[in-house]
Amino acid sequence: MDSIEQQLTQLRTTLRHHEYLYHVMDAPEVPDAEYDRLMRELRELEAQHPELVTPDSPTQRVGAAPLASFSQVRHEVPMLSLDNVFDEESFLAFNKRVQDRLKSADTLTWCCELKLDGLAVSILYENGLLVRAATRGDGTTGEDITANVRTIRAIPLTLRGDNIPARLEVRGEVFLPQKGFEKINDEARRTGGKIFANPRNAAAGSLRQLDPRITAKRPLTFFCYGVGILEGGVLPDTHLGRLLQFKEWGLPVSNRVQLCDSPEAVLAFYHKVEEDRPSLGFDIDGVVIKVNSLALQEQLGFVARAPRWAVAFKFPAQEQMTFVRDVEFQVGRTGAITPVARLEPVQVAGVLVSNATLHNADEIARLGLRIGDKVVIRRAGDVIPQVVNVVESERPDDTREIVFPAHCPVCGSDVERVEGEVVTRCTGGLICGAQRKEALKHFVSRRALDVDGMGDKIIDQLVEKEYVHTPADLFRLSAGKLTGLDRMGPKSAQNVVNALEKAKETTFARFLYALGIREVGEATAAGLAAHFGTLEQLEKATIDDLQKVPDVGIVVATHVFNFFAEESNRDVIGKLLEEGIHWPAPVVINVEEIDSPFAGKTVVLTGSLSQMSRDDAKARLVAIGAKVAGSVSKKTDLVIAGEAAGSKLAKAQELGIDVIDEAEMLRLFGE
C-alpha cells in the first residue's frame, strides 16, 4: 500500500506543480495532453483505491489558487471543469452512460460547440449593468478582473433588450485571435518585450495585467457559453435557447453551434470542425458536447469536479514532449541561416515530427535551449513544427550549448548579423550553393545586367545540371551547351550567347546592383557608383566612408563592407572582369559648372511618371549634377512627386522639404 500512496502523492504533487504554472504563472511547462494523461492516471488509481482519495486532490477541484495581487471573488455557483474524451469509442461510451443514467432509450439531443482555448471567466450583470468579472481560479474562488474585462470591446457593459434578469452571471471564454497574437509578438520582438508561446498564454497574460491600460491595447475577444447565477428572471429551458437569448441581450456567442440528434451526428460535427480548424482564425482544442435539455441536465447532475451532462471531445494533441538530439543550420535562398532542431521522433497532431525550426539565435536565447533538453513541440495546421518551451525541471546533466557557426555551413564564407536584425546571413552571395539560383536570376534581370532571353527556367536548369556555379560561369557558356537544355533550340541558344556578350557592356551602377549586395537597390547602387567612381575605390571604403553616400546608413554600409571583405566575392568579381565585363570610365561632374537648378541637390523620386520612365528621370538628374536617393531624410533637398505618391511625399511634407510635380520637373529640364 505504501507504493500506491507514494504514486498518488507523486502524481498529485506533479499535477499541482503544472496547475500552478498554467493557472497562476501563465507559463505552462508541459502540453495539455501530458497534463490530461497524468490526470487520467491519478483518477484511475483513485478509482481503484477510493479510501485514499483526499479532499485536496487535483481530481476534486479545478485549477489553482489565485494570485494574491488581485482581490479574490468567491463563486456563488462553482465554476466546474469538464471531463474529456479523446476518441470515438470513449464518446460513445459517454453517450451510453448518459442514456443509462436517464433510464431511457430515447434519442438524446446534444448541443455541440467549439472548445475555445483561452481563459474561462465569469461576468456578473445586475439589472443589465456589468458589475463584476472574475477568473475561474480553483473553481470556488477566482480573481477579480473587472477593470480588465471592461476594456474588452466584445463584452457589453450594459445588456440590451427586454426581460433582463435582476442578477445574471454569464460564463464564457476570453481568447486572442491568431492575428492579434501575431501582432502582439511582432511588437514584442520590435521592443524587446515578452514573446508568448501561444495565443492562450497571451490571452491569460493580457487579461491578468494589474494595469488595465495594458489589457486595453490587446485585441482580446469573448464568447459566452453558460450561466451561473440567475435571480429575478427566466431563461429558456434548453442550452441552445439560452445561447440565443444571450445573443439577443448583446452577448457574443460563437456561430459554430449545432444541435445533433444522434451520436453519429455529433461525430460528424466533430470531424467537420477538426477539418475547418486551421481556417477559424482562433485556437480551439476540441468540441464541447452538452445535453440540450436543462431538465435532463438537472436530472443527470454533477460529479466532484464536472457535470455528468457534458463532455469535452478533444482533438489529437498539437503539442507533445520530446528531446532535442542535435541542432543543424540550414541556409536559405537569401542567405539566411536558420537553426533546425533534430528531435527524437514524436507524433504531433497525427504527424510524425523529427525536426522543428528554431528561427534564429534570439529565439534560442529566449527559450534557454540546449542540445539534449526535453522540450514541448507544437504543430498547428500546416505550420512548421516549432519548439514552444523547454522543460527545465527535467533537464538532463549532459546538455550542450548551441553555438551558431562563424562560417556558412554550405560555402564556408563568413556570416554576418547586423545590429538591429535578428537574422544571421551568409556573406558569400556569389558562390554559395544555397543562394545560387536566386543570385543568378537577379544578376541577369532587366534592371541588372539585362540578359535578354535568360529566364528563370533556364537558370534553374543551368544550376541543376551544374553548368553554372557563379555569375562568371554564365559568360563561358557556349551555344552547344545551351542547346542541351529543355526547349532550347540552336537559334535560341545562340541568341542567349549573343545577349550575354552584349551584357558585358554595362554601367558601374548596374554592375553593383547585379551583385545582389543585401539592401543595395538601384538607387543605392547609383549613389555608390557616383560617389566612389571606381570599383577599386569602393572596395577600399570603410564603413565610415560608405556612410558619406546619400541614403546609406550603418546597416547598408555594413552589408556593403562585409560583401567586399569576403574573399570569395572578390574572386568572382575578378573573374567577371576577366570575362570582359566593363563600363565607361567615370565622368567627373563639376557641379559648379553645371547650369541647372538640380545641380548639387539630393533628390528623391516618388510615384509614377507619365512622360518618361523613372530610370530615364534618374539618368537625366544624375547627368545634370543631382544625387538621386531612394528615401526621404533630413538630407533630402527636393522631392519629385508623380501620380499616386505615398509615404515618401507625406514624409517630405512632414519635414518641410520642397516638393514639385512631374510637369515642373520637365520645365526645369528645359522641355
Swiss-Prot record:
Domain BRCT intervals: 593-671
Pfam families in alphabetical order: BRCT, DNA_ligase_aden, DNA_ligase_OB, DNA_ligase_ZBD, HHH_2, HHH_5, Nlig-Ia
Catalytic reaction list: NAD(+) + (deoxyribonucleotide)n-3'-hydroxyl + 5'-phospho-(deoxyribonucleotide)m = (deoxyribonucleotide)n+m + AMP + beta-nicotinamide D-nucleotide
GO biological process: DNA repair; DNA replication
Keyword Metal-binding found: yes
EC number(s) given by UniProt: 6.5.1.2
Keywords: DNA damage, DNA repair, DNA replication, Ligase, Magnesium, Manganese, Metal-binding, NAD, Zinc
Coiled-coil regions listed in the entry: none
Binding site for NAD(+): 32-36, 81-82, 113, 136, 173, 290, 314
Keyword flag Heme: no
UniProt xrefs under CDD domains: BRCT_DNA_ligase_like, LIGANc
Required cofactor names: Mg(2+); Mn(2+)
Residues holding Zn(2+): 408, 411, 426, 432
Leading EC class: ligase
UniProt GO cellular component terms: cytosol
GO terms of molecular function: DNA binding; DNA ligase (NAD+) activity; metal ion binding
Active site: 115 (n6-amp-lysine intermediate)
InterPro entries referenced in this protein's UniProt entry, alphabetically: BRCT_dom, BRCT_dom_sf, DisA/LigA_HHH, DNA_ligase, DNA_ligase_AS, DNA_ligase_CS, DNAligase_adenylation, DNAligase_N
PANTHER family: CHROMOSOME TRANSMISSION FIDELITY FACTOR 18, DNA LIGASE
Entry similarity comment: Belongs to the NAD-dependent DNA ligase family. LigA subfamily.
Function: DNA ligase that catalyzes the formation of phosphodiester linkages between 5'-phosphoryl and 3'-hydroxyl groups in double-stranded DNA using NAD as a coenzyme and as the energy source for the reaction. It is essential for DNA replication and repair of damaged DNA.
Entries under NCBIfam families matching the protein: dnlj (TIGR00575), PRK07956.1 (NF005932)
Protein's recorded name: DNA ligase
Gene: ligA
